[in-house]
Amino acid sequence: MKTRHRILTVLLTALLVILLPVSLIFGTSGSEPPFTGAALTYHNQLKEKGFPADYAVALTRLHLLYPAWEFEPLAVARSWKETVTLQTRDAKTNLINSDGRFSKYRHKTNANLYDSGFYQASKEAVSYFLDPRNFLTEADIFQFYDQQTASATSRAALETVLAGTFMERAKLESGQTYADALMQIGKEVGIDPVFLAVRLRQEQGDGKSPLLGGKCGSLLQEYYANQTATTESGKPIKPPAPGTLDGDLTALDGYYNLFNIKASGDGVFAIYKNALEYAQSKGWNTREKALRGGAEFLKNDYVKRGQSTVYLQKFDVCTTDSLHQYMQNVGGALSEGRSLYRSFAENNLTDIGCVFRIPVFSGMPALTSPDPAD
């Protein structure tokens, strides 16, 4: 009966979305909320918490589907205009993949490539990904999932994230699987193992990065000695000029950086070298140490600073004097959030209590920021 009731609720909610005018769906200023009874009461409670009307309408719809979910507003000190200005001031703050599929998100006039294969994102693209109202849907809202209040993660959910990746069956130096290690590290560090796994997928992709192999120092030495211009995939390497580099780069062999911490710079050479030198400074001479060290870095440098969602780690709206952001990919939070959702959905965990911490800006435009690709 519970399943039948849930299906009926979903169907009725979907039908309501189809039949209602767009102005009601998004709660246009001056319109009456499309709810009655308990739903209207909940909608009004959201507004009393501090959510604007357009947020409250979308979140009430989610509440009808997932009553255990909780939504908390995060009042942002900067205005919307100030935030967009800060996020677009430096070309490298928000980047978009050079793949032609994302061409509509590129800056209109800046044709420079950054970090070996990324263009500056346009102001319109930044506004779109920054605007929380664009992502108050069942899957996309998981970029606001609060790690500080995460419920106990099941191993099945973790294994769903690892499935089909280089981590699925691989073992670490101790003989532990990635799933075993992530469950243990997550518990000991105090950070959701599923979140860690999603971040690893985002950062490492197919698992072929030299930062995972333990021989990246030798690769850098080869790039430097041969003055190699590009990688096999065509990414610019930009090695230092001959005679300008002191020391033996092979000393960086045996170090690992699974979360790509400090992996930035102009060209592949700088990206790998910076990441390896950071790993060396932390003593990450096994993949297991790199896993634990990366998790501790995320906990101490982000979650404890209030940046406890992937959105807040991408778009730092917590600090007032500077930007403290984990990633440059303008769509990174959306991508990671969807991965989190899939893990929950495929393991029937969407009905458990989740807390979503959603930024609210002053001076937001009346309409949501449009998707440049539309």
Summary of predicted features, one role per range:
Residues L219, T244, L276-Q280, L291, ...:
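Extracellular protease catalytic domains of secreted zymogens
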